[in-house]
Amino acid sequence: MELDELVTRREELLRVARAHGAVSVRVFGSTARGTAGPSSDVDFLVELESGRTLLDLVALGRELGALLGRRADVTTPSALHPLLAKRILAEARPL
């Protein structure tokens, strides 16, 4: 899935994200780099409003995956591995 495909569905994706407490949604990984293949997942980097839990994050990933028809991995900046965080934050593109 290419980034421009996600952008065309931006409002729908952000509506789902907001319903699960996401206040910022970015795309990273192969989709952001333009190297995604037909079976690639979509990686989302989100910031959650205060009081949201891991359950919200998991539910968001499932709903985004169902909406896109492919696996959606969702993580937060604080959950990024320190050795990968700088690269991921640099390539992340706002939805």
Q: How should these model regions be labeled?
A:
Residues V27:
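Conserved histidines in hydrophobic membrane contexts and catalytic metal-binding motifs
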Residues M1-S24, A32-P38, E49-L95:
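Catalytic core of pol beta-like nucleotidyltransferases
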Residues P38-S39, F44:
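A short, structured beta-strand/loop element
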